[in-house]
Amino acid sequence: MAFASDESASPWSSTRLAALNAQFEPHGPKAILNWATHTFGDDLAQGTGFGPSGIVIMHMLADLRPGTTVFYLDTDLLFPETYELCDDLDERLDVDVTRVHGGLSLDEQAEQEGEELWNRNPNRCCFLRKVKPLRNFLDDRRAWITGVRRDQSERRADTDILSWEGQYGVFKINPLANWTQKEVWKYLFEHDLPYNPKHDQGYPSLGCVPCTEPVDQADGYSREGRWSDRDKTECGLHTSPEDEDGAHAAES
C-alpha cells in the first residue's frame, strides 16, 4: 500500500495528520513502517526497552531497512536479563542497536539528588535518566518509532498511529497502536524471536529494577507491575508535560 509522502512541512497540519491516521488504520504495521522508512530515511529511529512490541518492530525494520537505528535508554537500573536480550537481538537482527545514556552516574545522581531518588521522587528520576536523555538524542531526528499500543493501559487507549510530539520536536510513529497483546506474542512465536524470560516469571512489563514488580494476576493491561505502590503509570516519555502530576516539571 502506498501512502501519501510529502515531508516539506514540519510540523504537518492537524488535518494532514488526521488524514494519514485514517489511511494507516486499516493497514498492518509493516505497511506503516515501510511508509516511515521511505518518508524519513536516516532521520528515523526506533526507541525500545526490548519488550515484545519493540522486538516485533525491530524484526520488521531489519527486513524493510537494514541498519535502521534502534536505541534504548540505559538508566543503569535495567534488569540483567534486559541487557542480555539487547545483546542477543543486536547479534540476530540487522539493525543498529544504540545505547543512549544521560551521562549521569547513579553515584552522581545520589550526590546531587540524594539516595534512591526513584523511591522519593520517581518523576524526577525518570526525567533525569529517561526523558532528558531522550530529548537530547532526538534533537537531530525527525521521527521516532515506539511500541506503544492502545491495549497496554487506559492512558494509552486513544493512541494515534502518527502524531507530532512537540516536546521532542519529532513525529511519533506507533505502528502497533491497534495491535493486541495476543497478536504481538503470535508474531514473536511465529518468527522464533527471543523475549525477556522475566515475562514468564510474572512480569507483564519491564522497566528499571527498583520500580518493577511481578504481579500475581494481570487485569488485562500489559503495563502492570510498574510503580505498583504509586499513582503513576508512565515514566514520562509518552506523556505531555502536564501529565503524571507534572512529571516534566520535575526538571526544574
Curated annotation (Swiss-Prot):
Biased composition range(s): Basic and acidic residues: 221-235
Function statement: Catalyzes the formation of sulfite from adenosine 5'-phosphosulfate (APS) using thioredoxin as an electron donor.
EC annotation from Swiss-Prot or TrEMBL: 1.8.4.10
Subcellular location: Cytoplasm
Region called Disordered, residue ranges: 219-252
Cofactor, free-text remark: Binds 1 [4Fe-4S] cluster per subunit.
Protein name per the record: Adenosine 5'-phosphosulfate reductase
Tree of life domain: Bacteria
Family: Belongs to the PAPS reductase family. CysH subfamily.
